[in-house]
Amino acid sequence: MFKFALTQTLCLAGSLSLAQHNPHWWGNRNTIVHLFEWKWSDIAQECESFLGPRGFAGVQVSPVNENIIAAGRPWWERYQPISYKLTTRSGNEEEFGDMVRRCNDVGVRIYVDVLLNHMSGDFDGVAVGTAGTEAEPRKKSFPGVPYTAQDFHPTCEITDWNDRFQVQQCELVGLKDLDQSSDWVRSKLIEFLDHLIELGVAGFRVDAAKHMASEDLEYIYSSLSNLNIDHGFPHNSRPFIFQEVIDHGHETVSRDEYKDLGAVTEFRFSEEIGNAFRGNNALKWLQSWGTGWGFLPSGQALTFVDNHDNQRDAGAVLNYKSPRQYKMATAFHLAYPYGISRVMSSFAFDDHDTPPPQDAQERIISPEFDEDGACVNGWICEHRWRQIYAMVGFKNAVRDAEITGWWDNGDNQISFCRGNKGFLAFNNNLYDLSQDLNTCLPAGTYCDVISGSLIDGSCTGKSVTVNDNGYGYIHIGSDDFDGVLALHVDAKV
């Protein structure tokens, strides 16, 4: 009897972990966008007017729970919880629920950035949250949950990142560290996540996952409800989980401890793709991109060029401030069949703490758009750059087609096919790429979706004529506005 029960439990755990890697995308859609710090009402409108029609699969939204109000309203205040009430600068619970429903109705899934590791850091005196809840973080008193000091690990500072105890039981940058082995803490976290599932979300991005023991997270994940069938999810669907685990390959707490529980953020992807398109590594080496570079297996890796944290750091990571290289890196990211892809949608920043665009009363303002659909009032909206949303369409068009026809010049000019459905070429050299290349596409004329769009049968940018052998003449000048060209079967003139 015991052996049967144990086997049954292990099988259930295995099936749950496998299910938690499924993002529940509609049809052939397969790209997530992080609409960082957007309001819920604006996200709902964006799903209906842009993301759905452009074929985006889902949105990662900023934390939904009540947070501390910090002076100047820096973005990171959202990562300092006061309670699990669904009231933030992005909106209230009613507005959040309306957004989730409207996005699901147009095939765009919602993934919530959730904070299970900690509550707010120290605050002088009584802190007031975005829903008006009072707390005394220094005393570890959060009546809005409620949590008291007994629900937290003892106060200590992380001084040695090679010490597992410190990494997982001390306070990350002073944030009060919850004890996830506590039955009470577990129950409150599960209750919070289950409420979001009831409202129709498809899954969660788990912040600071490496700072929590994997066995505690496994318990929490396995205790969650199935996704809400009223929002179009099949019966017995499990929430998609992707976990923030920063692992550069030499960490005491490894990404491998979490990869079977759900997807894991592959930070090495971000660093190495930045190195390549900054010119620090020849593009020819990208032929073995993915597990050949020591990355996680494709289905366990959440991949990105930059995220809301590392785009603010110096180093190899590319961001919107290097637009030509950034668009090339994003095109490669979305064209190469590796990982679960997420693109960034930022707001402009001058320093690490810059808040999102806000009015004189410190209320987040809605994005505004010019005649081309680009954002103009402090929002960057990379997802609205033609070169990026066109590659979301490219990724949808080629879907599961394999890499074929790799070509390179031994340096920084490369091209490859995605079966007979798509073709990409890149030029990161200081001289032109002018070459007859195998596009692997059926004969015909194709619109380069990077330089233009196919409108009423005509291409507004470059076009390439492919002969009966699949070859076409490819030209990317060293001083072209974009260093990449993309063709696919859904953009045939």
Swiss-Prot record:
Among its keywords, does the record have Cytoplasm?
A: no
Q: Do you know which CDD domains this protein is assigned to?
A: AmyAc_bac_euk_AmyA
Catalytic positions are D207, E244
InterPro entries (UniProt xref): A-amylase/branching_C, A-amylase_C, Alpha_amylase, Glyco_hydro_13_cat_dom, Glyco_hydro_b, Glycoside_hydrolase_SF
Q: Which cysteines are joined by disulfide bonds?
A: C47-C103, C156-C170, C375-C381, C417-C440, C447-C459
Q: One GO CC term of this entry? A: extracellular region
How is its cofactor bound, per UniProt? Binds 1 Ca(2+) ion per subunit. Binds 1 Cl(-) ion per subunit.
The answer to keyword Signal applying to this record is: yes
* Major location category of this protein: secreted
| Amino acids binding chloride | R205, N307, R342
Q: Which domain of life is it from?
A: Eukaryota
Top class in the EC scheme:
hydrolase
- What's the cofactor? Ca(2+); chloride
Keywords of the record = Calcium, Carbohydrate metabolism, Chloride, Disulfide bond, Glycosidase, Hydrolase, Metal-binding, Pyrrolidone carboxylic acid, Secreted, Signal
Q: Which reaction does it catalyse?
A: Endohydrolysis of (1->4)-alpha-D-glucosidic linkages in polysaccharides containing three or more (1->4)-alpha-linked D-glucose units
UniProt record similarity statement? Belongs to the glycosyl hydrolase 13 family.
How does the record describe its quaternary structure?
Monomer.
Q: What is this protein called?
A: Alpha-amylase-related protein
- Origin species: Drosophila mauritiana
- Source taxonomy lineage? Eukaryota, Metazoa, Ecdysozoa, Arthropoda, Hexapoda
